[in-house]
Amino acid sequence: MDKYSLESVLAKGAELVKRKGIKCLVIDPYNKVRDTNATSDDVNRYTMDYLSKIEQFCKKYDVLTFIVAHPTKMYKGQDGKMEEPTMYNIKGGGEWYDASYHGLLVHRNYEQKNTKVKVLKVKFQNLGENGAEAFFTWEPKSGCYIPEVIEEQQKEDLPWEA
């Protein structure tokens, strides 16, 4: 598969905003969409410039952009289990944490056969809670992830139920 340039993806995104009124753009995966106009070979500088261009695009067109960035190779810990990645495990990780408004982890646990979604960063606390997590199970018949209900959750009233 050929690599796409960030400039061409953002130009197509701008076109889709005007023609179709899109409100969300997904870049997946990050490492296949290269910033061909990058001025630095330094990974941290490259990452910061990349994220700055996306932030400018989002503000200009009032679009939410999701960037799917896979971590570097993860290793098993001393307990034999795969470590849970953080934003720092993405190449240029410090910049990902510093420059992003939000960060979500989607981590598959093969032993428990579920997937965890965890909030790693929320810039504005009224939009979420750092460390909040939810678990999902893949349902192959429907092709959907089904939320797992934890016993503690069943006992607590949700804010709109109180």
What is each stretch, according to the model?
Residues 29:
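Walker B catalytic acidic pair
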Residues 46-52:
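Well-ordered, non-membrane alpha-helical segments in soluble/globular domains
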Residues 63, 68-70:
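Conserved H-loop
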Residues 32-35:
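Residues immediately C-terminal
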